[in-house]
């Protein structure tokens, strides 16, 4: 954006601020990749409500179909962003908090696989396998970054659990597809990773540097409700 003074600003001593950056592909945030996790979770819950309570199945399937399209659109946009603006993507991956959202697309792909499996098992099952493999890779890379000391205190925030929750979530879908042994393996890996990361988060909460005021309020409200 332009940073030149407008005519008359200098004479009257008015503060001059640079205009906000225009919303472009370069500024598309990585945390948006978590959106399919929310819509897909509601869709899968509605599917179960159809079996248990008899609610209309079309609502859940429509939500899941929308989730699949949303996942494709967001991943495609981020891929295009990485091609056109690699420095912007690398900057987010170096961010201590936003890097955790790099695992969101693999969880979204698990949800898409669960949506497709009843309709096209030949497609849903392989997609689950691909999602699990990629998710394990992302989770291990993130854990390596933490244990190697490159994860500063700011990294130990609630979004850090996204990569590790996915390892426990994968069996929920995998067992129904027939991947019983692989699901047990993923569950075991998820528990081990949780045991490795949870103490770090608790130490950050009780003995680490003060949390940002906004995060303090969120944790206080969540604690008050329990």
Question: What annotation goes with each model-predicted range?
Answer:
Residues 1-15:
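N-terminal amphipathic/basic-hydrophobic helices that include classical n-h-c signal peptides
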Residues 17-45, 60, 64, 85-111, ...:
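Juxtamembrane helix-loop boundaries in multi-pass membrane proteins
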Residues 46-59, 114-125, 170-185:
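Helix-coil boundary and interhelical linker segments in multi-pass alpha-helical membrane proteins
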Residues 47-59, 76-89:
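Membrane-interface helix-loop junction between the first two transmembrane segments
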Residues 62-73, 122-136, 183-194:
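Structural signature of hydrophobic alpha-helical transmembrane segments
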Residues 78-86, 114-124, 142-148:
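Transmembrane alpha-helix boundary signature
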Residues 138-142, 172, 196-205:
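Alpha-helical transmembrane segments in multipass membrane proteins, preferentially the mid-helix core
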